[in-house]
């Protein structure tokens, strides 16, 4: 039966080329937009390489100081982090990092680069794929060695396609030696950078023991998925008498990537609000699907009306309304899946165009063209969206068809 439905679907598509083109256009554009949007969300919150431990990784990027009922938020300093959150019992390892930018001028071309100061533990928490060399280790961090791990994009810029290991390049007037080359992380990730160097080469480190404000973040890899233990231990460490003078209390904020996204999308910078985030994302997805679904419903109603004689003949030979509803819904789902596959293909080019468009606003610091990656999660979500769109746009016209008067249908008219 399904085989016959598939054959009939293609015959109808070829017979009604105008409606087929409109339907496929609406579906493919809808799925294209949904795919790009889903890919963006997936790159932010999912455990994609090199951040394979995102579910149990916390980013500590803010400290709140309370004094006389007033609150002051700041990015913590390296000295504050090293003094107060090292050797946590609930964590497997802790890494410190900060991101800066520097400009290079090569072969008449000016380019901006993202520079990340970090430590040896950064490479234990993440899982970067090294195409050349290796990461820097504890001794190199302790000694303040001017060594660097660079991305493939940075290698292509400074060294073309030649081997980069052992070669030097300038960063803010100082020469760094390349010891490793990695595939880039997502530009939407906290671990993204063009160049990674030991934090001990950072001349802007806050060295004062009492300094609280700075530019550094901490990445905490929990031993288990129970992140409440890490947060409880952090709260116990923030004993004001032993940490910071001249304030009443101190609070640090450490969240996973999902929680970071939830904070930003719910307009609450202190705590994640999943309910509000789900509402915001849900509204966006509904808007993406509702408008084209309404258009497809109208097209399907018209298309079914033009098949009135066919429907009348089938009814007169004993086909039930349920049989016809199943047929038309399956036809619509098949067409929707075809449009969805086209939409997935279009999303690849659309994402590249979007990146090029974004790069026009900042020609120095350009995003990689492969910033949007279609993972199996995105593919599965888009497949589900196709099925949902097919059902939404097909059930109502099919139900209307089931009420069609047989006599009107056989005369070539309809009472839809």
What are these regions (language model features)?
Residues 5, 25, 376-416:
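C-terminal membrane-exit region of the final transmembrane helix in multipass inner-membrane proteins
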Residues 6-14, 294-335, 400-414:
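Intracellular coupling helices
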Residues 8, 16-44:
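Short, strongly hydrophobic transmembrane alpha-helices
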Residues 20-29, 309-355, 380-389, 397:
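Transmembrane alpha-helical interface segments in multi-pass membrane proteins
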Residues 37-104, 109, 117-119, 212-216, ...:
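Membrane-proximal extracellular/periplasmic loop immediately following the first transmembrane helix
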Residues 45-53, 348-378:
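Short juxtamembrane loops and helix-capping segments at transmembrane helix boundaries
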Residues 88, 97, 106-135, 140-142:
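The feature marks short, hydrophobic/small-residue-biased sequence motifs that occur predominantly
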Residues 119-135, 146-269:
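Mid-to-C-terminal secondary-structure elements
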């Amino acid at each position: 039966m399904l085989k016959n439905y598939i054959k009939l679907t293609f015959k109808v598509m070829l017979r009604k080329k105008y409606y087929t083109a409109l339907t496929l256009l609406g579906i493919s554009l809808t799925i294209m937009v949904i795919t790009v949007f889903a890919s963006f969300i997936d790159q932010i919150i999912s455990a994609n390489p090199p951040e394979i431990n995102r579910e149990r990784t916390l980013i500590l990027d803010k400290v709140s100081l309370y004094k006389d009922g007033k609150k002051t938020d700041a990015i913590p300093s390296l000295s504050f982090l090293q003094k107060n959150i090292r050797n946590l019992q609930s964590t497997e390892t802790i890494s410190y990092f900060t991101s800066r930018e520097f400009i290079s001028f090569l072969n008449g071309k000016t380019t901006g680069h993202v520079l990340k100061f970090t430590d040896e533990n950064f490479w234990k928490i993440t899982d970067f794929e090294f195409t050349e060399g290796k990461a820097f280790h504890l001794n190199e961090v302790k000694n303040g060695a001017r060594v660097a791990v660079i991305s493939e994009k940075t290698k292509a810029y400074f060294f073309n396609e030649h081997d980069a290991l052992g070669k030097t390049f300038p960063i803010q007037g100082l020469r760094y030696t390349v010891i490793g080359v990695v595939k880039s992380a997502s530009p939407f990730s906290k671990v993204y950078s063009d160049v990674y160097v030991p934090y001990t080469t950072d001349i802007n480190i806050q060295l004062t023991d009492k300094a609280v404000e700075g530019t550094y973040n901490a990445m905490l890899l929990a031993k288990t998925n129970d992140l409440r233990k890490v947060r409880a231990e952090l709260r116990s460490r923030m004993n004001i008498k032993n940490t910071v003078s001249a304030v009443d209390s101190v609070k640090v904020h450490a969240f996973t990537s999902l929680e970071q996204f939830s904070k930003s999308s719910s307009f609450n910078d202190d705590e994640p609000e999943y309910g509000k985030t789900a509402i915001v994302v849900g509204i966006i997805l509904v808007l993406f699907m509702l408008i084209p679904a309404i258009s497809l419903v109208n097209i399907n109603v018209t298309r079914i009306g033009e098949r009135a004689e066919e429907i009348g003949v089938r009814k007169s030979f004993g086909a039930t309304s349920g049989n016809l509803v199943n047929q038309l819904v399956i036809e619509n789902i098949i067409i929707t899946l075809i449009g969805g596959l086209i939409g997935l293909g279009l999303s690849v080019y659309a994402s590249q165009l979007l990146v090029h468009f974004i790069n026009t606003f900042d020609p120095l610091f350009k995003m990689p063209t492969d910033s949007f990656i279609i993972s199996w999660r995105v593919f599965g979500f888009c497949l589900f969206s196709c099925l949902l769109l097919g059902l939404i746009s097909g059930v109502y016209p099919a139900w209307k068809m089931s009420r069609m008067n047989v006599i009107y249908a056989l005369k070539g008219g309809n009472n839809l």
